[in-house]
Curated annotation (Swiss-Prot):
It comes from Arabidopsis thaliana. GO terms for cellular component: cytosol; mitochondrion. Catalyzes the reversible stereospecific interconversion of fumarate to L-malate. Catalyzes the hydration of fumarate to L-malate in the tricarboxylic acid (TCA) cycle to facilitate a transition step in the production of energy in the form of NADH. It is an enzyme of class 4 (lyase). The gene is FUM1. One of its GO terms (biological process) is fumarate metabolic process. HAMAP family: FumaraseC. Fumarate hydratase activity (fumarate to L-malate) is strongly inhibited by phosphoenolpyruvate, citrate, oxaloacetate, ATP and ADP. Malate dehydratase activity (malate to fumarate) is activated by oxaloacetate, pyruvate, Asn and Gln. Malate dehydratase activity (malate to fumarate) is inhibited by citrate, succinate, ADP, ATP, glucose-6P and phosphoenolpyruvate. Its EC number is 4.2.1.2. Substrate binds at residues 127-129, 157-160, 167-169, 215, 347, 352-354. PANTHER family: ASPARTATEAMMONIA/ARGININOSUCCINATE/ADENYLOSUCCINATE LYASE (PTHR11444), FUMARATE HYDRATASE, MITOCHONDRIAL (PTHR11444:SF1). Keywords: Lyase, Mitochondrion, Transit peptide, Tricarboxylic acid cycle. Disulfide bonds: none annotated. This is Fumarate hydratase 1, mitochondrial.
Length: 492
């Protein structure tokens, strides 16, 4: 069958539409089967496990292409949820033969074995109904195969069996939380812990290197390079604390609220049982949501988590910028740090090496900040009993988690771990700074100290020479007071 004919059978539209739709398929199918939903029959590629509603969504939401597909963690979370739902539903009367087949099929989804059968994009209904039905249809057809039946026969029904006691309105917010909590625990927290540990190690390594401080990008009083890196380490530690503190709200699951939060079409105790099953399956402390109406109508937990990621991005932006500026040069910049040389930096300037890890990280931070805007707008658009920005909230949040996790790991491995101090340059800049004059304040007063600094700057002489010329100090007094190593903390 030609691509044109195949696509016509799928879309039923114009030649242009049909050809455009054909190009969106991951692979061109040459055979089809008939699937049905309440709208009637539709042709589905024979080699795909999805059914009628997924096929209609493919045709109705051709937005963004491959890069806009529903995030894989959401798909895997659907596998976890549907497996747990079947397990609990068997306690409430679901045929064990069907239930066990659903559990086996759902496990394959959770393991990522059926990812190619989840083609839908984020840009669909705001409740995520199409993706919920995608999961229901794939699991139903795979369960049918496990039972020795054919796809599309509906001996395992996507709604009656796989989606039993569920609504898209509670399943999608549930998988949002499962996916986010899982990714944060498995990816983000380990990456940030490693980055924090390495920054802390550098702080100790550099603890005795006294350097000039800078405020307003201008010279200030001294500190140690270790103190500077200690500030970075603490920022990351606080970021870890912030995101960890959001997890208790993510651990609350909406499942059991069904359509509007009342729990219609579920049995008493279903919500508690399924949360416990998910907790056991993921080894994370999931519980049923305290209030299902809040869990469906709002996504404040996701906004809160995204806010913590936004703060982490803010911290990492500052850290990466400081490090690349301190490493600027090699001859005409600040040059206090020597950054690892990972790759050639210019296609025209031979020998140039750039702070690429810092640049990559700062771009990631910008993206995370943008994602937080999307999550904030999405979270603010919960109308009455249902928020209908769920897919974009989930996508943006998971994108931020993955980006920060990966970028932090890359930054730690390819930059921070290999940073060295340029001791000679640091010492030179330290002893050229006019701000060492601050240590004279207690002895000669602010006004006299300012006069010393201005004279030294105007005449191009040293602070000591200026102080002696003004007659405010003896040489011995100056040498006793202006000791950078004694200016890095409170006096006794």
């Amino acid at each position: 069958m030609s691509i044109y004919v195949a696509s016509r059978r799928l879309s039923g539209g114009t030649t242009v539409t049909a050809l455009r739709y054909a190009t969106s398929l991951r692979s061109y199918s040459t055979s089809f089967r008939e699937e049905r939903d309440t709208f009637g029959p539709i042709q589905v590629p024979s080699d795909k496990l999805w059914g009628a509603q997924t096929q209609r969504s493919l045709q109705n939401f051709e937005i963004g292409g491959e890069r806009e597909r529903m995030p894989e963690p959401i798909v895997r979370a659907f596998g976890v949820l549907k497996k747990c739902a079947a397990k609990v539903n068997m306690e409430y009367g679901l045929d064990p033969t069907i239930g066990k087949a659903i559990m086996q099929a759902a496990q394959e989804v959770a393991e990522g074995k059926l990812n190619d059968h989840f083609p839908l994009v984020v840009w669909q209904t705001g409740s995520g109904t199409q993706s919920n039905m995608n999961a229901n249809e794939v699991i139903a057809n795979r369960a049918a195969e496990i039972l020795g039946r054919k796809r599309g026969e509906k001996c395992v029904h996507p709604n009656d069996h796989v989606n039993r006691s569920q609504s898209s309105n509670d399943t999608f917010p549930t998988v949002m939380h499962i996916a986010a909590a899982t990714e944060i625990n498995s990816r983000l927290i380990p990456s940030l812990k490693t980055l924090h540990s390495t920054l802390e190690s550098k702080s100790f390594e550099f603890k005795d290197i006294v350097k000039i401080g800078r405020t307003h990008t201008q010279d200030a009083t001294p500190l140690t390079l270790g103190q500077e890196f200690g500030g970075y380490a603490t920022q990351v530690k606080y970021g870890l604390n912030r995101v960890t503190c959001t997890l208790p709200r993510l651990y609350q699951l909406a499942q059991g609220g069904t359509a509007v939060g009342t729990g219609l079409n579920t049995k008493k105790g279903f919500d508690v049982k399924i949360a416990a099953a998910v907790a056991e399956e993921t080894n994370l402390p999931f519980v049923t949501a305290e209030n299902k109406f809040e869990a469906l109508a709002a996504h404040d937990a996701c906004v809160e988590t995204s806010g913590s990621l936004n703060t982490i991005a803010t911290s990492l932006m500052k850290i990466a910028n400081d490090i690349r500026f301190l490493g600027s040069g090699p001859r005409c910049g600040l040059g206090e740090l020597v950054l690892p040389e990972n790759e050639p930096g210019s296609s025209i300037m031979p020998g140039k090496v750039n702070p690429t890890q810092c640049e990559a990280l700062t771009m990631v931070c910008a993206q995370v900040m943008g994602n937080h805007v999307a999550v904030t707008v999405g979270g603010s658009n919960g109308h009455f009993e249902l928020n209908v920005f769920k897919p974009v909230i989930a996508s943006a949040l998971l994108h931020s988690v993955r980006l920060i996790a990966d970028a932090s790991a890359s930054f730690e491995k390819n930059c921070v771990r290999g940073i060295e101090a340029n001791r000679e340059r640091i010492s030179k800049l330290l002893h050229e700074s006019l701000m060492l004059v601050t240590s004279l304040n207690p002895k000669i007063g602010y006004d006299n100290a300012a006069a010393v600094a201005k004279k030294a700057h105007k005449e191009g002489c040293t602070l000591k020479e200026a102080a002696l010329n003004l007659g405010v100090l003896t040489a011995e007094e100056f040498d006793t007071l202006v000791v950078p190593e004694k200016m890095i903390g409170p006096s006794d």
